[in-house]
Amino acid sequence: RKVTAGNCGKCHVKEYQEFMKSRHSIGWQRMLECGKLMALPKDTCSEKCEQCHNIQFKCDSCHTRHTFSTLEAKTPEACRTCHMGSDHPHYEAYISSKHGTIYTASQSMILKESQSVQSLRSPVCVTCHMPQGIHDMSFGLTRGPAGSGLSYVDRNGATIDDIELAKKREDMLSVCNTCHSLRFAKKTLTIADDMHKNIGAVIGEARDMILDLEKEKQLFPSLGEMTKIPLASHAFILGDLHVYTGKSRMERLFITLTQSAAVTWKGAYHENP
């Protein structure tokens, strides 16, 4: 019998309620709705996609069996398994930033089980994304994927209005302000916002080029000849994440562009030059 997050929630009520507000709690659902992933061979999807997206059902993705250590869950290495790679290089952006460099260089100061992350010289993932130990990892996030053409949405797919986005930004600034001046934090995040916007414009221009090529019947194979999937073929090709199945050369170049873009804008928010 599998132990689910709901089982843990019978005792850890507060943590479970916070988890259910986070995007982690809809990881499996989002995977099933993602045609580009469902189009992959079943064994590939099982071995790759499902190993991270199954976090929707359990707590031991972060504090693993059989110790369920809170210390383990506090470390960047616990996040690394899923939050790395060409499509979402969060760990790489953090660990090679100045924050990550200090963390790596001061491993002799590694946390003891009873300590808090405030004991470290530098912030780790949970310092900013799970302040005070909250289990809603969407804390303070105000930007969606660059070039997606979509406003930032909540876990239910509803667009978050400007008032709520402003509040989330203030929440994140309050975390930055723990170590940095508010002026410095605002300037840094504004620069990252501009980077995100500029990259989105470049991706949008490239996307339009591909669609124009399709209209002119210059895309081989054409979008209409793509592997049958539950989403529209344009969403499959030009959405946030990408796979190489059945792609034309132009689309493969577009995939490379989006991967480079992810490194750039995620690096900006993690203060990685």
Residue positions per predicted region:
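Short sequence/structural segments immediately N-terminal
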Residues: 1-273
